[in-house]
Amino acid sequence: RGLVGSEMCIRDRIEIFPSEYIHVGGDECPKVRWEKCPKCQARIKALGLKSDKNHSKEERLQSFVINHIEKFLNDHGRQIIGWDEILEGGLAPNATVMSWRGESGGIEAAKQKHDVIMTPNTYLYFDYYQAKDTENEPFGIGGYLPMERVYSYEPMPASLTPEEQQYIKGVQANLWTEYIATFSHAQYM
């Protein structure tokens, strides 16, 4: 039932938005809760998913869902993008990865020949504080991130070969607005 509901939701988005790419998230999936969820465990058992040295069976369940959604989107002429958590459990065949928890997810995806958008929070999260004196700053959700650090970011990891570097497609800076109360606050950040 859940997968059918996901397809219906995605089908609605496809009809509204013409973009080739659909971002499917992949973060904020509470796998520790899935360990205790009887329905999740029943689904894991029914699918025959197993843990191994690299992935838990709950990560494999997320990969199953992401792969299903990717196939659905590909069948409708679209591509998926997801946060680097979609690497956990095995990456869907055509997925683009947005590496936000540092660069390691992007490096791993590029080594697997997947397109990558670098968006590491330690360089490109604009909802972080811009001054050390946080008491006199508009509210920020993260730590201190001066513009000098943002400008210093080199999105092409030296650890990748020239062939692997071709999969790094660009960068994205994020401003998450759940803690941004006003438009002027957003402009300041």
Please identify what each model-predicted range represents.
Residues 12-16, 20, 68-76, 112:
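Generic, well-ordered alpha-helical scaffold segments in large soluble proteins
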Residues 79-95, 100-189:
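Flexible, acidic glycine-rich loops studded with aromatic residues
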Residues 1, 32-58, 63:
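Aromatic- and acidic-residue-enriched carbohydrate-binding clefts of CAZyme catalytic domains
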Residues 1-5, 9:
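Single conserved hydrophobic/aromatic residue that forms the stacking wall/gate
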Residues 24, 73, 97:
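Conserved, mostly hydrophobic/aromatic
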